[in-house]
């Protein structure tokens, strides 16, 4: 069976890694690498403390979070020594004790069904510094020991490397979809038209430009996201700290080597723009410094900028598109893409060779977001 994957972000790379283990599959991966959300992302894996009301979103992200240890075990078995994911715990901050209590109640209830949450501890503002030395915020937090962090760029690179080792072809090329003389969907490459038994479109916010020329409407929009990278150079300030989710849009992700990731922006009016916004980056930096003053001494390493994909109801979709059973698609993962994307990628790999899903996928079917035009 010959399968193409278009897009090598978190979904495409995970799908490629899983499919490359199947010796009956001839796999080709296409990705031009421009604007990819995953390569720009370092993320917090801790969906259990989210207060989003959408149960389908929670079910998917919780399953994605629980898949990470399994995926890391696979990478380790295949020789990876620097794992991109680590369980370091997460601190989730709230403005008032009442909101903190509400969050604790939600998390405690969810822990009855999800052991991966780990230990939950409510921490007063003045005690946060025992978890993150130098912390100077005025809000309390819930500490979730099961929370983790992942370097999206490293995770993608490692999975693509292993896929190539397993025989997959990875092409750095921008491709499109079209129909041949018989009406079959084919991949248009720089060297001509390529036919495949199955095609997986995992191109994030760019899914519209690939699918709509085939005669469909796609409910996906782009959102620009910016992160900043800092580095603490003083040895005493480095440590294995939990990731920190502030009550606004800002997260702080400390790494053991002294690197600190701060972000991210959620810009709905910038389309596919990938330029630095010094004003927004400075605002994020100042907000982070208010609660973590040691960042004022940090070296500014640069920024990461990518484009996320969102649907109108903020729920991801994945599966085969209407009336095209050989074409699979995934998009709309938004800012929780690193959490749900590994599981979606694994599911698409499985669905492309076997119609029996490992997970109830009906709520995420593309038919809810992709309509055939008459």
What are these regions (language model features)?
Residues 189-198:
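Core beta-strand elements of the Rossmann-like FAD/NAD(P) dinucleotide-binding domain
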Residues 81-92, 109, 119-166, 265-270, ...:
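Helix-loop-beta segment of a Rossmann-like dinucleotide-binding subdomain
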Residues 294-374:
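C-terminal catalytic lobe of FAD-dependent flavoproteins
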Residues 44-127, 287-289:
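Dinucleotide-binding Rossmann-like beta1-alpha1 core, especially the glycine-rich loop
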Residues 4, 14-21, 30-32, 43-44, ...:
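Active-site substrate-recognition segment that forms the wall
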Residues 59-63, 93-101, 142-158, 275-280, ...:
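Short beta-strand to alpha-helix junction loop
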Residues 1-9:
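Beta1/beta-strand and adjacent pyrophosphate-binding region of the FAD-binding site
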Residues 148, 169-185:
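A conserved short coil-to-beta-strand element within the FAD-binding core of flavoproteins
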């Amino acid at each position: 069976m010959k399968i193409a994957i278009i897009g090598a972000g978190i979904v495409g790379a995970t799908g490629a890694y899983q499919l490359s283990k199947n010796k009956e599959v001839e796999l080709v991966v296409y990705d031009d690498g421009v604007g990819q959300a995953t390569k720009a992302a370092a993320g917090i894996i801790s969906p259990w403390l989210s207060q989003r009301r959408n149960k389908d979103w929670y079910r998917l992200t919780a399953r994605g979070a629980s898949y990470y240890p399994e995926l890391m075990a696979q990478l380790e078995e295949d020789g990876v020594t620097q794992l991109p994911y680590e369980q370091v715990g997460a601190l989730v901050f709230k403005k008032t004790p009442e909101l903190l209590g509400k969050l604790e109640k939600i998390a405690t209830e969810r822990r009855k069904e999800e052991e991966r949450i780990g230990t939950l501890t409510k921490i007063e503002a003045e005690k946060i510094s025992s978890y993150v030395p130098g912390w100077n915020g005025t809000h309390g937090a819930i500490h979730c020991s099961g929370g983790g962090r992942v370097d999206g760029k490293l995770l993608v690179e490692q999975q693509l490397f292993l896929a190539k080792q397993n025989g997959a072809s990875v092409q750095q090329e921008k491709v499109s979809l079209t129909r041949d003389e018989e009406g079959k969907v084919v991949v248009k490459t720089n060297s001509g038209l390529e036919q495949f038994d199955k095609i997986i479109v995992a191109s994030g916010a760019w899914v519209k430009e690939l699918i709509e020329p085939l005669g469909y409407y796609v409910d996906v929009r782009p959102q620009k996201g910016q992160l900043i990278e800092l580095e603490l150079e003083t040895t005493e300030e480095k440590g294995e700290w939990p990731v920190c989710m502030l009550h606004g849009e800002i997260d702080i992700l400390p790494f053991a080597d002294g690197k600190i990731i701060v972000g991210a922006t959620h810009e709905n009016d910038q389309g596919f723009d990938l330029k630095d916004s010094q004003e927004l980056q400075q605002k994020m930096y100042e907000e982070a410094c208010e609660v973590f003053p040691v960042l004022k001494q940090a070296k500014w390493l640069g920024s990461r900028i990518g484009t996320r994909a969102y649907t109108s109801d903020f729920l991801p979709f994945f599966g085969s598109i209407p009336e095209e059973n050989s074409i699979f698609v995934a998009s709309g993962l938004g800012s929780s893409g690193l959490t749900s994307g590994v599981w979606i990628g694994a599911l698409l790999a499985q669905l492309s060779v076997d119609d029996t899903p490992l997970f109830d996928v009906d709520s995420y079917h593309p038919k809810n977001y992709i309509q055939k035009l008459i």
